[in-house]
Amino acid sequence: MSLNNSSSVFLDSVPTNTNRFQVNVINENHESCAAGIDNTDPPHYEETSFGDEQNRLRISFRPGNQECYDNFLQTGETTKTDASFHTYDSHTNTYYLQTFGHNTMDAVPKIEYYRNTGSVSGPKVNRPSLLEIHEQLAKNVAVTPGSADRVANGEGMPGEEHAENKEEDNKAGAVKFGWVKGVLVRCMLNIWGVMLFIRLSWIVGEAGIGLGVVIILLSTMVTSITGLSTSAIATNGFVRGGGAYYLISRSLGPEFGGSIGLIFAFANAVAVAMYVVGFAETVVDLLKESDSMMVDPTNDIRIIGSITVVILLGISVAGMEWEAKAQVILLIILLIAIANFFIGTVIPSNNEKKSRGFFNYQASIFAENFGPSFTKGEGFFSVFAIFFPAATGILAGANISGDLEDPQDAIPRGTMLAIFITTVAYIGVAICVGACVVRDATGSMNDTIISGINCNGSAACGLGYDFSRCRHEPCQYGLMNNFQVMSMVSGFGPLITAGIFSATLSSALASLVSAAKVFQALCKDNIYKALQFFAKGYGKNNEPLRGYILTFVIAMAFILIAELNTIAPIISNFFLASYALINFSCFHASYAKSPGWRPAYGIYNMWVSLFGAVLCCAVMFVINWWAAVITYVIEFFLYIYVTYKKPDVNWGSSTQALSYVSALDNALELTTVEDHVKNFRPQCFVLTGGPMTRPALLDITYAFTKNSGLCICCEVFVGPRKLCVKEMNSGMAKKQAWLIKNKIKAFYAAVAADCFRDGVRSLLQASGLGRMKPNTLVIGYKKKWRKAPLTEIENYVGIIHDAFDFEIGVVIVRISQGFDISQVLQVQEELEKLEQERLALEATIKDNECEEGNGGIRGLFKKVGKLNITKPTPKKDSSINTIQSMHVGEFNQKLVEASTQFKKKQGKGTIDVWWLFDDGGLTLLIPYILTLRKKWKDCKLRIYVGGKINRIEEEKIAMASLLSKFRIKFADIHVIGDINIKPNKESWKFFEEMIEPYRLHESCKDLTTAEKLKRETPWKITDAELEAVKEKSYRQVRLNELLQEHSRAANLIVLSLPVARKGSISDLLYMAWLEILTKNLPPVLLVRGNHKNVLTFYS
């Protein structure tokens, strides 16, 4: 409610007996403006006694008008000085009270912000983003008070008026039903079927009044629990069309929804045939009585059924409005028929009816019929199985949820009331017919007996009839024998026949509409892509005409087959499977404890819903065990199919919520478990940047973390935080989606930082969750380090130092061509854009050539000129020109091949493990895990260790013993005894030439000059440093010679990473070590664990 200054608004109408604080807004006269600002009265407070329960405190605001406020702003007295502060505040408080939400960039809560894109209930509006209300305003931009916010809060929103008018037009054009016509009527018609008129009397005869009522109540319990679950799900958010399918799919996900939706739609389609055949059989019986058969009973049923289903199709195609009118008419007929039965029970019975077992209400008959009298082959559960389908139909209203004005209110109210009314009617009919009609009667008026003569002691005997011969020979009348008992008892028999017609036709019509609506919703979700054709709707109500035709074809086929006795149990089980899943959906959503599960309908319990699901499954087997098995098998195969296809939908199902809860519980439980070496697994940070830019680095890491460890692809955005955060946030979902699309079970994480090292340091400290915290850093080798800026080298080596500081293992991967293919991706993207533009240009020209009356070629060029279509040309500085000059395909071929080398099967070969230093076993564990993978399983492990020349055999035996205790299979062990000898002169000369540009050579200069150079270039390699680590430098050069000698042909080399002591070895010297160590080799993994055991030989 808005408070306008020009109108007088009083809030005195608010009930005062419940308020302790009341605000009275009283409009003052316009003359108050002329009096000046200082004359504005402050809020007036009226105190009341504490004994006054109606009001404790009243505040009366006396607002002025907008003109007064504008004049006040123009006076310039807006500064909050001591003299004016009170005046300013007392006056403008009123203004801000009236315009809250329109004087701030923040948007006030509106329903439009929470709609989905393309919502049928109204347009979606985007609220101002957090950046828009948080970032600094642009300079030299004048901001008028309140003007910046009118769009955000709905004033002057572009196209808003049009959208609202359009929404109103849509609402005016589409036919929407309330809870009575839309749900109550449909559910009652669907629940009241032919069972009410032709089977309920037989059920009372078999089970008796007592157990008959129990059967009705047990069936009602199943449907009532399902109704409660349906109501809870339907009130947990906006419900669209699709009925049971929509409720199940949005709760349990597309796998369950897609499988049950298809069989539910099919069951409704076949149910049309069942109801139509029931109608046709009744008509054929009437034709028999009048001797008016057309061909024979079977073919007459087919003819009448076909004509009937065509008429029903015509009513459905005419639109939901006509269908609803037909349902109302059928309900009226049905109610008259039921009332006709109850009236007939009090009309005195004649001799003919008495001979057929009807004696009006008799206590003796009630007592006799109260207990069961099951005939041969029948029992409680068999009778229950026959009655239960009569209680179904509770989803008839929910199935047209898209055509309801307010599904959240209509479905709970209409469904539960329909269950109650129909249950009362069933119980009433059962009790009445059981109190009026005996179980067996001959139908012969000659079976009367003289009063007082003892016969068989039955109730009929006491009423003057002897039906004892029915014990020895079959009789035609009575509850057990005559299916037309209700027609006999009723006041006017033909009305019961009309009721049967109404029950069958209304159920058939409801099933026809339900099948088409559910099927259309299923097809719209594109879960089964081949069925997309049936998703199209027509007219203002989006009528599924194609679905109607398909349902008609299915119904016609089963009418012509005329083998419904076989298919009927399966159809009943299909419905029960839907009920079971609806109950399980309600339980599952409650059990998942998702904050999004907050149904407005609170009369439900998750354990009751679970009991209902189990009860539905049990009833399925009670009705027909083989039909239940078939139902489960069909549903299972559809579930597997949908799971395999993985439809691209995200409905926030409870399955997703439970996955989160399960993961959270497991993660929390994991924190209580102490680390143990047997449970160690590599959990890796991988500095891939965008995962698509360094696929080879990700592939090799994923090879030893797949299904056994954690893999996080990390990217650091370096630069101004404002720009970096925007770029980072915009690409995170896309990069995670790339991992999913490429079936890589990994996570993507990104940070924004001022420098690369700070970003990685943040990742090293903060990534992971509890025990699921990465313990290994995987980085690519910096191939072009000699051309890189010094800061990049310092950051690169610093990252390795940081990892060791945090006790995290390090793996450096080197391949000959390098990892980064971002340039290739950029070129590919540019080429794709050019190709799209070229195709668009050709399509436009082709369209223009096809048009007539444009003056031939001249007209074509004129039109192209008007369209301003020109052949795109690349920019001067674009990557296209660069690639063209360097022959892009040939230039990048090796890089592209290298980027996919770890995706391929490696074939027979070796993984050479140079386990030179004991780091806890990570250098050995990673290659062992690789050999377990399908792509690496043909590669054998060859182990190389250092040793003494005079103890090679002993150390080889010791290593073999250790590996066998670790249960690691290996092909060979080599003990290298000459690691510490000096490398050859050529190798050492290459190393010296490589580090020459970075040496300080302070020994050749005087002391002052040397000290000055050290201060100016502290990053250079000093002679003292080089001399101190000369033996280590020899070792790196010598190791490369040994690697060239022994492992040149290996598929992969895993080598102990040398550690550079902080403060002793400069960054450039360390990079020189790594360069000379891995030069001219197959792919190399330099590995260094955190020196904590990752292998054990204890059980």
From Swiss-Prot:
One of its GO terms (biological process) is potassium ion homeostasis. Glycans are attached at residues 446, 456. Residues 1-177, 223-259, 324-327, 401-417, 631-1099 are cytoplasmic. It is found in: Apical cell membrane. The keyword Transmembrane applies. Keywords: Cell membrane, Chloride, Glycoprotein, Ion transport, Membrane, Phosphoprotein, Potassium, Potassium transport, Sodium, Sodium transport, Symport, Transmembrane, Transmembrane helix, Transport. Residues 147-169 are annotated as: Disordered. InterPro entries: AA-permease/SLC12A_dom, AA_permease_N, SLC12_C, Slc12a1, SLC12A1/SLC12A2, SLC12A_fam. Phosphorylated at Ser-90, Thr-99 and Thr-104 by OXSR1/OSR1 and STK39/SPAK downstream of WNK kinases (WNK1, WNK2, WNK3 or WNK4), promoting its activity. Pfam families: AA_permease, AA_permease_N, SLC12. The keyword Translocase does not apply. Activated following phosphorylation by OXSR1/OSR1 and STK39/SPAK downstream of WNK kinases (WNK1, WNK2, WNK3 or WNK4). It catalyses: K(+)(out) + 2 chloride(out) + Na(+)(out) = K(+)(in) + 2 chloride(in) + Na(+)(in). The modification Phosphothreonine is found at residues 94, 99, 104, 117. It comes from the Eukaryota. Its main location: membrane. A motif (RFXV motif) lies at residues 20-23. GO terms for molecular function: sodium:potassium:chloride symporter activity. The modification Phosphoserine is found at residues 60, 90, 119, 129, 147. Predominant in kidney. The 3 isoforms are differentially distributed within the kidney: B almost exclusively in cortex, F almost exclusively in medulla, and A about equally distributed. When phosphorylated, interacts with PPP3CB. The RFXV motif mediates binding with OXSR1/OSR1 and STK39/SPAK. Belongs to the SLC12A transporter family. Renal sodium, potassium and chloride ion cotransporter that mediates the transepithelial NaCl reabsorption in the thick ascending limb and plays an essential role in the urinary concentration and volume regulation. Electrically silent transporter system. This is Solute carrier family 12 member 1. It comes from Oryctolagus cuniculus (Rabbit).
